[in-house]
Amino acid sequence: MCNRANANKDGVNNMMYLSKGLAVQKSTEEFRVSHCGKVFALGPEMARLWTNAQQAPKEVPAGKENYIRRLEQSGLAGTTKERGDLAHYRLLSGCIICPELDSDTKPVQTGYDGRIWTWIEQAGLRLTASELIRLEEQGTKPVPALLGEQGRQELTEQIYSSKELIWDGTLESEMERSPARDALVMSLLRLLRMGRLFWCRGGNGCETGCL
């Protein structure tokens, strides 16, 4: 399904990275990114690297590893040494997906992407890529009973209907092998390129910070 990263000429594995957070101020003098209730001011090089992977996973540029590590330590990027489809999944699986409701692009209403967008926009909790894959694997549709505040508990029970999936990391590991994985990841990447999404890392308090 994918190939491991090949070592470059210096023997260092290339990494892929994906930016997290939402740009809230862009100017020649200052670039600010909001993430989980905090605002970070980025210098020119950090801003360029963050913007580079804002709408799609990118390879870490040679010589920029320390910059990317600083972004990752601040929660503004995720990295992986995997390649291809698995790299995309690994980068997305640990993120909470947040809808960009102020986007200038047209709403996504039909087809596969429309269904995924409905979950992201209308579910009573912020979903992860792994949870969306689980819903697709089950063939679960975004019906009114599973949406909004009133559907939060039922939706959670639907996703975690198997008690084994409750343990940390179990769902991510299981969905990595799901036949529904690649289609869902590609849908998320399309929505990301359209400016409909931004990413937030997991963790206590993070969900509220993204709303």
What is each model feature region?
Residues C2-N6:
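Short, positively charged and aromatic/hydrophobic N-terminal segments
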Residues D10-Q55:
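Short, amphipathic alpha-helical interface elements at domain boundaries
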Residues K38-L211:
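Long, charge-rich, low-complexity alpha-helical segments
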